[in-house]
Amino acid sequence: MEYRRVKDQESYDVVSQKDIESPGERSLSSTSATSSLSTAGASKGKNSWKLKSIVTLALTLLTSSQAILIVWSKRAGKYEYSVTTANFSVEALKCLLSLIALYRTWNSQGVTEDNRLSTSFDEVSVYPIPAILYMVKNLLQYYIFAYVDAPAYQILKNLNIISTGVLYRIILKKKLSEIQWAAFILLCAGCTTAQLNPSSDHVLQTPIQGWVMAIVMALLSGFAGVYTEAIIKKRPSRNINVQNFWLYIFGMLFNLVAICVQDFDAVMNKGFFHGYSFITVLMILNHALSGIAVSMVMKYADNIVKVYSTSVAMLLTAVVSVFLFGFHLSLAFFLGSTVVSVSVYLHSVGKPQPQK
Amino acid sequence: MEYRRVKDQESYDVVSQKDIESPGERSLSSTSATSSLSTAGASKGKNSWKLKSIVTLALTLLTSSQAILIVWSKRAGKYEYSVTTANFSVEALKCLLSLIALYRTWNSQGVTEDNRLSTSFDEVSVYPIPAILYMVKNLLQYYIFAYVDAPAYQILKNLNIISTGVLYRIILKKKLSEIQWAAFILLCAGCTTAQLNPSSDHVLQTPIQGWVMAIVMALLSGFAGVYTEAIIKKRPSRNINVQNFWLYIFGMLFNLVAICVQDFDAVMNKGFFHGYSFITVLMILNHALSGIAVSMVMKYADNIVKVYSTSVAMLLTAVVSVFLFGFHLSLAFFLGSTVVSVSVYLHSVGKPQPQK
């Protein structure tokens, strides 16, 4: 009971924090990940399954520790820093790590057609699109709270799962088997069940405007994810760090706009890094690494794996919070976790015959 | 919210009413069902699927109207009659309907080895076993409430779903595919989710004795159901009405014992039918017909179909109650219903290759 109450307050912050950060929710390889990445380019057939597992595990662990860090930072006191500068820092850090990884690749393999930074207008012209989609979604987020309260918004966010599945099918033209579709519906129902709390029923009183906005936001978010996958997969031999560099450049650009619009005065008067603590730095580092993991998952797996990974992370966070913060798990959480587990199982056994 | 509160009080009564009635939860053919039954014996191969669907639908509709009748009778006032005499009446009515159906069969087909009432000791000796199992379970029911409250008991009752599946596999040696097992776990989780209410979390505080008793009760109930199926299916050509007649004779016998133990004085002083109203008669009729439907499902389908049927009936009851009694459905109900629906779908697509 206590767990859910605190979690709801927290997860709203996770939402605002995470969603505004989303333009850069793609990746680059951190120094430690670089080597596996660059070798993977060479012998990718053999290592593909291994790589897929590693990036999925990394995303799951990073996403779950992300929520825990936010709870921890909240317990330590209120946010003193401006969220927009933190998001910009995340983008900048990812951009920097991309360049470091690229530099190492250039040193070991030399500059090739696939790993050189310079690009054509045709190639780069699609890169701002995900960032624009996330920006529109973040704008809508300010308006939806006129119709929906924060816990109800948490529930409605699970529509993302369905929209990602549908757009993945339509845009990337990849097939899911009937059992995998059933598993996807279960994933959505299971995640929502795990998040149920005594005030969840409010969501049923959501007015039609709220529903429309929630659905539009889910579509925008799903579209941005699927579009990013399409960009990254369009040229499989292209170095992921170059692709990320260009994605993050636009992420920085759009976050710069956000700083100017929202926090211009605060940054001018108090400075860019005002209120940053050790935990703020940890959170920025975690977000940057999570971004890397998301991008890796997009390159070596797909959006479906990403959705499963972040859903399992949500459950992991709750379980870890029991030990770290003494939260209590509800019966709904156990039931939702059971449904999510069965969904993961069904997704893996329900592969369509000529998979991928 | 209101729905769930009222439903919990009611469904506890459903429990006590239904469980004590259970020894006779098998069937005979009502006059209208008789013809389809007797013809089915002849051309059973062709009509098997049709018959299976009809009996399943009948069971679903009768079970859902059963709970509605109980809510209705409660609204009309408290039970004035003794539950044990009502249960005895249900058994007696089913016994009578069995005999009527048999009489019609004898007239049309003559007395054969398969439809004659007389039996060997070997054949009849197994018939009291389900009744004994239900009696032990009903005895346990009086003690479990020392450890578990009524809403928590409602939640724990869903263990029946799992125990039925496991015992069905072990005793009847029938195979479920992996996907069907997954579907069965989902059915249990979905039904429990649909019944969640703000006080459901109490169940997590159930002491170990409560868990043990709940599991033993689930096993007894599952065993009784599976054993009944084994008895009925042992001799497929045997007329179902003869099989039911002997089951119900023992049902009457054990209910007679229950009357003597619980309500002897009341029956002696006020009479057997004291407090019976029009709705009491309707309920007895409904219980008798539900018993018929369960028995038909055992003969022409199986325990798994029975569990699905009664689970869907539980959801139907809730939806119908919205219109009849102005109940409100919770978000948990929608989520649980979604999971149950997906489970039904998975059970049907997940058939093992050489099914049955």
Swiss-Prot record, chains A, B:
GO molecular function (one): pyrimidine nucleotide-sugar transmembrane transporter activity
Biased composition (Low complexity): 27-44
Tissue-specificity statement: Expressed in roots, leaves and stalks.
Subcellular location: Golgi apparatus membrane
One matching Pfam family: Nuc_sug_transp
One of the GO BP terms on file: transmembrane transport
Region (Disordered): 1-44
Basic and acidic residues: compositionally biased ranges: 1-24
Keywords for the protein's UniProt record, in alphabetical order: Golgi apparatus, Membrane, Sugar transport, Transmembrane, Transmembrane helix, Transport
InterPro entries listed in its UniProt record: Nuc_sug_transpt (IPR007271)
Spans traversing the lipid bilayer: 53-73, 83-103, 126-146, 150-172, 176-196, 212-232, 240-260, 278-298, 315-335
Superkingdom classification of source: Eukaryota
The keyword Transmembrane helix is assigned to this record: yes
Similarity comment: family membership: Belongs to the nucleotide-sugar transporter family. CMP-Sialate:CMP antiporter (TC 2.A.7.12) subfamily.
Protein task: Sugar transporter involved in the transport of CMP-sialic acid from the cytoplasm into the Golgi. May transport important nucleotide sugars such as CMP-Kdo (2-keto-3-deoxy-D-manno-octulosonic acid) in physiological conditions.
Name of the protein this chain belongs to: CMP-sialic acid transporter 2
Gene source species: Oryza sativa subsp. japonica
Lineage: Eukaryota, Viridiplantae, Streptophyta, Embryophyta, Tracheophyta
